[in-house]
């Protein structure tokens, strides 16, 4: 079994090697639109052979889903934003949470791809996520990209920035400050903004 955090090719490219594949219900529903477009773009950028992803055959998961791995029951938390159906997986037995790309992996959370939610919707999603993470705030969190475990300061200096509940809290605050124009994003194409330990990259049309 493969449990995907979201439908992007850098996470699902080898999904065809598994008999059972789980994916957020909203990602399955959005596949034929912006998510497939984002996948085609990312596959092209990485110069990978094209593949067909039979997403319609994947097992949909929601916040009510529990995955029983032989007595180790994995809890699902919905966290739309990076994709419409992004999810986190909570392993209570090993006291860890797999966050995928929902809140970044130390570097910025990427919200500029086709299918990413607008900022106000992402902020609302983060509010629900913070509440869901309260009981497991002391669990170790594993992001989706090891090579992105470092943040970067205003002058480009890198620092170790592991995914924690504090990063999610700072992301929520950052979204609010961007919407209230208390923080102005920098950049001309993709925009970037930073607050505390959180950083976000998004498009100008998402600032609403």
Tell what function each PLM region has.
Residues 11-14, 30-32, 106-108, 149-153:
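Short catalytic/ligand-binding loop motif for oxyanion handling, primarily in non-cytosolic enzymes
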Residues 1-68, 166-167:
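Active-site HxH/HxHxD metal-binding segment of metal-dependent hydrolases
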Residues 8, 27, 108-109, 113, ...:
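Flexible, active-site-proximal loop/turn residues at the rims of small-molecule/cofactor binding pockets
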Residues 1-10, 22-25, 78-81, 98-100, ...:
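Active-site neighborhood of phospho(di)ester-bond hydrolases with catalytic His/Asp-centered motifs
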Residues 14-17, 34-36, 92, 111, ...:
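Short amphipathic alpha-helical segments
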Residues 25-27, 34-37, 41, 80, ...:
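Short, flexible active-site-adjacent loop segments at beta-strand->alpha-helix junctions, enriched
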Residues 13, 52-124, 128:
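Catalytic core of the metallo-beta-lactamase
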Residues 127-208:
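Accessory terminal helices/loops
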